[in-house]
From Swiss-Prot:
It holds the Pfam family Ribosomal_L22. It comes from the Bacteria. This protein binds specifically to 23S rRNA; its binding is stimulated by other ribosomal proteins, e.g. L4, L17, and L20. It is important during the early stages of 50S assembly. It makes multiple contacts with different domains of the 23S rRNA in the assembled 50S subunit and ribosome. GO terms for molecular function: rRNA binding; structural constituent of ribosome. The keyword Ribosomal protein applies. Belongs to the universal ribosomal protein uL22 family. One of its GO terms (biological process) is translation. Part of the 50S ribosomal subunit. Keywords: Ribonucleoprotein, Ribosomal protein, RNA-binding, rRNA-binding. HAMAP family: Ribosomal_uL22_B. This is Large ribosomal subunit protein uL22. One of its GO terms (cellular component) is cytosolic large ribosomal subunit. The lineage of its organism: Bacteria, Bacillati, Bacillota, Bacilli, Bacillales.
Length: 113
């Protein structure tokens, strides 16, 4: 059985969030929390919140053992881009793309043996 949590339209660039997601993919939940707490990236607290939600979903919805959970899937997709303009010299303007992410974490119980 799998439990899933998704954070949609999070205001962090997918490229930056993927750096942190790659650190925890395939790890046990306790180990993943430790990694996230000691990773000095802006995406760490956001991903920790999504992981906490996935663990809570596993415990509440599927009666899984929290101490026996492993992250089976973790990925970041691109969300909608907010387009802004920055005024430049001589009346020009340049585009600023504020990128957003959809962060998905799937946890399941560890296989016995």
């Amino acid at each position: 059985m799998q439990a899933k949590a998704v954070a949609r339209t999070v205001r962090i660039a997918p490229r930056k969030a993927r750096l942190v997601i790659d650190l925890i993919r395939g790890k046990e939940v306790g180990e993943a929390f430790a990694i996230l707490r000691h990773t000095p990236k802006a995406a760490s607290p956001i991903i920790e919140k999504v992981l906490k939600s996935a663990v809570a979903n596993a415990e509440h919805n599927y009666d899984m053992d929290v101490n026996n959970l492993v992250i089976t899937q973790a990925y970041v997709d691109e969300g909608p881009t907010l387009k802004r303009f920055r005024p430049r010299a001589m009346g020009r303007a340049s585009a600023i793309n504020k990128r957003t992410s959809h962060i998905t974490i799937v946890v399941s119980e560890k296989k016995e043996g």
